[in-house]
């Protein structure tokens, strides 16, 4: 939210997710702090000095940075971190991975986010349920199909996520087969959102 300090543990490289998340944070009115080429200890120092509210990184790096803090004797609770937004690889919706990260960062909650280079940001974690991702239906028309027959699957069944982009002019995609296997939630989401909810992440 506006006024939050968000630390991005990425360098300004070709990873598209970093750029879109960094830009989104600044558009929201957050102070966006890039990690650049700092070491783990250096990044922890910046986080401590600025009392950051949120950390953006991959799930494995969130765990790694937490282990570095333990090894260095850094009291991460003094940072005041409240949210860890993970992307770039599977993990944030896997209960054991999420629990490990939240154990290493007491007081912080993990939020999973998923996207892809071909289409951009695709899902965000439900605020009411860990491990449930909502598709950004204002940007995509999602379908879930049987990867072998290309027929639609019922809610609760696992299938391949197919996306049609809405409003993209430079590189629109129609019924793009992502290769990602997902399971649509069988009941309405308690958060009240009507966007497609994916149970268990990607």
Residue ranges of model-derived segments:
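Short, composition-biased local secondary-structure segments
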Residues: 1, 14, 67-71
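Conserved AMP-binding loop of ANL adenylate-forming enzymes
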Residues: 2-32
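Active-site glycine/GP-rich loop and adjacent strand/helix microenvironment
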Residues: 28-202
């Amino acid at each position: 939210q506006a006024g939050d300090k968000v630390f991005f543990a990425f360098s300004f490289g070709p990873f598209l997710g970093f750029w879109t998340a960094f830009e989104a944070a600044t558009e929201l009115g957050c102070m966006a702090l890039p990690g650049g080429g700092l070491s783990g200890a250096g990044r922890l120092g910046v986080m401590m000095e600025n009392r950051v509210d949120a950390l953006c990184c991959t799930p494995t790096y969130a765990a790694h940075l937490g282990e570095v803090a333990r090894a260095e004797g850094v009291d991460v609770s003094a940072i005041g971190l409240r949210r860890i937004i993970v992307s770039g690889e599977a993990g944030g919706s896997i209960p054991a991975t999420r629990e490990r990260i939240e154990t290493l960062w007491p007081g912080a909650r993990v939020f999973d986010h998923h996207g892809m280079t071909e289409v951009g940001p695709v899902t965000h974690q439900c605020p009411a349920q860990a491990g449930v991702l909502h598709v950004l239906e204002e940007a995509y028309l999602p379908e879930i199909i049987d990867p072998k027959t290309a027929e639609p699957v019922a809610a609760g069944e696992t299938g391949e996520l197919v996306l049609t982009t809405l409003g993209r002019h430079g590189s629109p995609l129609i019924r793009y087969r992502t290769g990602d296997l997902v399971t649509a939630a069988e009941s309405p989401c308690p958060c009240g959102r009507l966007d497609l909810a994916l149970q268990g992440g990607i």
